[in-house]
C-alpha cells in the first residue's frame, strides 16, 4: 500500500516539482486536501489533461476528526494510492497532514513523502544561518506585549543555544512584524527575510538588525518567513 504526500503547496510553482512527482500524482484518484478548489487548480497545473471529475477529494481542516480521517483512508486500505495536498507548503511539516500520516502509520500503511519545496528548509539554506540546529515556531502572538516578549525569547535562544529561529506572519502583517523585530532585537543580531520562495520575485536577504533599519522592502502582500541568528 502506498500513501503519497505531495509535499508541495498547491499555490506554489510547478517548476520546482520533479517529473517523478507527476507520474505518482497521475496514478492517484483519491486526495486528502486542505482546500478542494485550490487542490483541483493545482492538479490542473500538473497536467492540463487530467480529468478532475473522476477524482475524489476529502477535506482536511480543523473540523476533521480522527474518525473522519480513518474513513478517508478506506481506499488506501483497499490497495489504492492516496495523496495529501496542503495549501502552501509541505504536508505534515508546519502544515496539515501529520494526523493523516499518524493514522496511516498506526494502520501499518506505507507512507511515501514526495520531494518538493519547503520554505523552512529553503530559507535556512539561503540564510547562511545554522542548519544543524533550527526551530520553526509558526505564528508569533498578535498582542504587542506578548509578541515583543516572544521575539526577545527567541533571540535569547539564538545566543544561548546557537540555534536558528524561524517564524511566519500573515502577509498583511509582515511589515509590522519586521518593525517589531527591529525594535526588540540587538543591533548585531542577524535577520534573514525570505519572501516568495521558489516563485517569481523571490527575495532572500540576510542583514544585521542595524543594517535593516530604514531599508526594508514592502512585504505586505507576499508570503514571508523570518529567521534570526547571530
Identify the meaning behind each predicted range.
Residues 61-64, 68-111:
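Glycine/small-residue-rich loop that forms an oxyanion/phosphate-binding "nest" at active or ligand-binding sites
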Residues 29-35:
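A short beta-strand/loop micro-motif in the catalytic core of glycosyltransferases
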Residues 10-11, 87-91, 171-172:
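Short glycine-rich anion-binding loops that position phosphate/pyrophosphate groups of nucleotides
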Residues 95, 99-157:
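Class I SAM-dependent methyltransferase SAM-binding "motif I" and its flanking Rossmann-like core
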Residues 58-65, 140-144:
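Conserved helicase motor
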Residues 5, 80-81, 159-230:
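A contiguous loop/helix-start segment that scaffolds small-molecule binding in enzyme catalytic cores
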Residues 1-14:
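Single conserved hydrophobic/aromatic residue that forms the stacking wall/gate
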Residues 33, 86, 111-116, 167, ...:
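General beta-strand structural signal in soluble alpha/beta enzymes
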Amino acid at each position: 500500500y502506498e500513501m503519497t504526500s505531495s509535499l508541495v503547496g498547491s499555490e506554489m510553482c510547478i517548476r520546482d516539482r520533479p517529473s517523478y512527482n507527476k507520474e505518482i500524482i497521475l496514478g492517484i484518484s483519491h486526495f486528502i486536501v486542505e482546500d478542494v478548489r485550490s487542490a483541483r487548480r493545482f492538479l490542473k497545473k500538473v497536467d492540463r489533461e487530467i480529468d478532475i471529475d473522476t477524482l475524489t477529494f476529502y477535506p482536511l481542516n480543523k473540523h476533521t476528526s480522527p474518525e473522519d480521517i480513518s474513513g478517508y483512508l478506506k481506499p488506501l486500505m483497499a490497495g489504492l494510492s492516496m495523496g495529501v495536498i496542503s495549501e502552501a507548503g509541505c504536508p505534515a511539516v508546519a502544515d496539515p497532514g501529520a494526523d493523516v500520516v499518524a493514522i496511516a502509520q498506526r494502520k501499518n500503511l506505507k507512507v511515501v513523502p514526495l520531494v518538493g519545496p519547503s520554505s523552512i528548509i529553503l530559507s535556512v539554506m539561503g540564510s547562511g544561518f545554522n542548519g544543524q540546529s533550527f526551530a520553526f515556531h509558526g505564528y508569533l502572538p498578535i498582542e504587542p506585549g506578548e509578541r515583543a516578549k516572544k521575539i526577545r525569547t527567541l533571540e535569547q535562544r539564538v545566543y544561548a543555544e546557537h540555534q536558528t529561529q524561524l517564524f511566519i506572519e500573515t502577509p498583511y502583517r509582515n511589515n509590522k512584524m519586521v518593525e517589531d523585530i527591529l525594535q526588540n532585537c540587538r543591533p548585531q543580531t542577524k535577520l534573514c527575510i525570505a519572501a516568495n520562495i521558489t516563485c517569481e520575485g523571490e527575495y532572500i536577504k540576510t542583514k544585521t538588525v542595524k543594517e535593516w533599519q530604514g531599508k526594508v522592502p514592502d512585504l505586505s502582500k507576499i508570503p514571508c518567513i523570518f529567521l534570526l541568528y547571530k
